Amino acid sequence: MAVDIQYSYSSMAPSLRRERFTFKISPKLSKPLRPCIQLGSKDEASGMVAPAVQEKKVKKRVSFADNQGLALTMVKVFSEFDDPLDIPFNITELLDNIVSLTTAESESFVLDFPQPSADYLDFRNRLQTNHVCLENCVLKDKAIAGTVKVQNLAFEKVVKIRMTFDTWKSFTDFPCQYVKDTYAGSDRDTFSFDISLPEKIQSYERMEFAVCYECNGQAYWDSNKGKNYRITRAELRSSPGKIEPYNGPDFGISFDQFGSPRCSFGLFPEWPSYLGYEKLGPYY
């Protein structure tokens, strides 16, 4: 945009007063300067930030091979190897190990009788009646070990285990060793035994033993109520069946529906009754 500026000089000479000087200023073609103070948008002025433009997510698409002209399945055919595979595992060794393991399990032995001391009342009655009774017995590494309780009838005494490995075609007596009692003055003595079992035992033969106690020229036996203490193979162990009824004397005891005795005098005759309590001395 052109700007005309006129100047008049009245104080100049008369010859120059009539002359006018005209200056014409044309604008520059350069871009105008930006102001140094910039006003933000209404959102920035109010403290709010304009949300960023969300990118458009590309939807996933599933395409199958048959849509692209390919096969859905891939078949691979393997041919036999020319050289045999070197398999480190031999199937024959596996079968031999299985057979040996089965044989070892079948040749393992177990006790075919309960621990005598598990039923303390029966154990005490047998000890008082027979003066000798097997207390405990265990099997360990082709050996049998246990303890025997005897009544202290005399100082000199001999305790031995009479055992057979061929159904009493022959037998062997193994002496027991005296075990010092912790409590002095007891009327019972303890003996221990440790017997090694043979390497080869025929499957049709029975292993049995009984306990013999010799004192004052007499022999007392504990033969497990006439059945002997049997050691049998694990596969031939007798299954627990019905408990044999007790054929001993009847003390007038009646049992309830749960098998508990209604009268304790027959099972525990040494327990003092209420009527005779004042006439009895101390129990020890």
Curated annotation (Swiss-Prot):
Motif (PP1-binding motif): 61-64
Pfam families recorded: CBM_21
Presence of keyword Cell membrane: no
InterPro entries xrefs: CBM21_dom, CBM21_dom_sf, Pase-1_reg-su_3B/C/D_met, PP1_3B, PP1_regulatory_subunit_3
GO-annotated biological processes: glycogen metabolic process; negative regulation of glycogen catabolic process; positive regulation of glycogen biosynthetic process
Swiss-Prot/TrEMBL keywords: Carbohydrate metabolism, Glycogen metabolism, Phosphoprotein
Name assigned to this protein: Protein phosphatase 1 regulatory subunit 3B
Provenance organism: Mus musculus (Mouse)
